[in-house]
Amino acid sequence: MTLGLGFAMSVQAQAAQPEQGKEYKNLRQPQPTDTGKKIEVIEFFAYYCPHCYALEPILSEWAKKQGDRIVFKRYHVLNPGIESQFKLFNALDSLGKVEEYQSKAFDAYHQQRNRLMTDEQVAEFVSKTKLDKTTFFSAYNSFTVKMKLNRVQRMMADYEIESWPTIIVDGRLMTSPSMSVAGKGRVTEQQQNEALLPVLDWLVAKAQKEKSAAK
């Protein structure tokens, strides 16, 4: 048996029944959701985070395949000195442009060495897109984006966010790529990210079942 096959089999076994406290954990205080019958799935991420960059295409594709089962939301975390990246994401979000430019913003940081740490660097990024600069910076400097600074700070505390990427399912179930391979020894980042998907599938199904039973 090859190492790759052995890992794949272990992932399949793990995905059958993720364990609370290993592949996922319950938040101490569940948070409210507003997604009706659909299951809310939140990703906390940062553009500067290499692990978030590696996960982005995999998680984005997974979310698209869920169709009407879920509502997928992203929140850029807050750290001192990265407010410009936070504002960039939220400006894109307010303009309905996240899906179009999310991977491009990641690429700017990780491939093109534009650190997006200043307004000038963000302007350089915008100049290489089809975004209207005036419209973008109106959103970037808006009161709405400033209000989100405080909101996300509170959310990070409420959702117990200490590292990223972190995924929250149904406002109460936390997982991440590293949690998804708990106890599996040394694995590659690609293997971590691939192992996350069956855990997410299981958590979404669990949340759906429990939501239906509560009616």
Name each region found by the language model.
Residues M1-G81, L200-K215:
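Extracytoplasmic thiol/disulfide redox context detector
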Residues R28-Q31, G81, E120, P165, ...:
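Solvent-exposed, flexible loop/coil residues
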Residues K37-I39, D68-V71, L95-E100, D132-K133, ...:
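Loop/turn elements at helix/coil->beta-strand transitions in domains of secreted/extracellular proteins
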Residues E40-F44, Q85-F86, P177-K184:
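Acidic/histidine-rich, surface-exposed loop or edge segments in extracytoplasmic proteins
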Residues Y47, Y53-F125:
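Structural alpha/beta surface segment adjacent to cysteine/selenocysteine redox centers
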Residues L131-K215:
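C-terminal cap of thioredoxin/glutaredoxin-like
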